[in-house]
C-alpha cells in the first residue's frame, strides 16, 4: 500500500490503478517520468514512492490544469496549491515537479525528455493520439523504447477499451495503437504501443 499523509490511499475503486503504477514503475526503473493529468496526485505519489525506493535519481514532471477547489471561496485555493502542499508535506517535492496548464499548449508543444509517459486526461483515443502524435520528439521517443501507460483499457472502461480502439483505428483507416491491460477493472492501467 502506498502511504500518503500517514494514511493509506484506500479508495478501493482506484487501488488497483495505484498499485499497478507502483509495480510497473518498479519493474521499469525509469529516470524521467512525465505524467499528463495529475488529478488528486495519488498516481504521482505511487510512482514517486517507487522512485524513492529504487533510488536512481529519477524524477517526475507532472502537468495539471489549475481550478478552484470545493470550499475555496472565489478561487483563493486551487487544486494545484493543494497538490504542491501535499507533495511537500510527504517529502516528494525533490522528486516531483508540478506544472500548471493545458498539456497540449505546454508539454506537447515543448516536450521534455522521458522514458515513461503516463496519460490520464479523461482519456479518449483522440486525446491520446493528439499527445503521442502531436510532436515528432514524443513519437520518436516512444518508437525508440520509452514506455507509455494510459488510464483505461479494461473492457468496462467507458471510453478506453478494445471496442473504442477498434472504432478509432477504423476512423483513421489503419491500426495506430494496440494496448495491453495490465491492472485494474473499470479504472485500469494499460501499456500502449504505437503500431
Predicted feature residues:
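Class I SAM-dependent methyltransferase Rossmann-like catalytic core
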Residues: 1-28
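S-adenosylmethionine/decaboxylated-SAM
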Residues: 22-195
Amino acid at each position: 500500500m502506498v502511504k500518503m499523509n500517514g494514511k493509506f490511499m484506500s479508495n478501493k475503486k482506484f487501488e488497483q490503478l495505484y498499485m499497478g503504477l507502483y509495480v510497473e514503475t518498479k519493474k521499469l526503473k525509469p529516470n524521467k517520468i512525465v505524467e499528463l493529468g495529475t488529478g488528486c496526485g495519488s498516481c504521482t505519489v505511487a510512482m514517486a514512492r517507487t522512485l524513492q525506493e529504487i533510488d536512481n535519481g529519477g524524477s517526475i514532471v507532472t502537468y495539471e490544469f489549475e481550478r478552484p477547489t470545493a470550499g475555496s471561496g472565489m478561487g483563493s485555493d486551487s487544486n494545484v496549491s493543494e497538490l504542491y502542499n501535499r507533495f511537500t508535506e510527504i517529502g516528494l517535492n525533490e522528486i516531483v515537479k508540478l506544472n500548471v496548464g493545458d498539456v497540449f499548449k505546454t508539454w506537447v508543444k515543448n516536450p521534455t525528455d522521458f522514458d515513461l509517459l503516463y496519460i490520464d486526461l479523461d482519456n479518449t483515443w483522440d486525446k491520446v493520439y493528439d499527445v503521442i502524435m502531436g510532436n515528432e520528439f514524443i513519437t520518436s521517443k516512444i518508437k525508440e523504447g520509452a514506455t507509455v501507460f494510459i488510464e483505461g483499457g479494461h473492457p468496462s472502461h467507458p471510453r478506453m477499451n478494445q471496442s473504442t480502439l477498434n472504432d478509432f483505428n477504423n476512423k483513421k483507416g489503419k491500426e495506430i495503437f494496440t494496448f495491453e491491460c495490465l491492472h485494474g477493472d473499470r479504472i485500469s492501467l494499460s501499456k500502449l504501443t504505437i503500431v
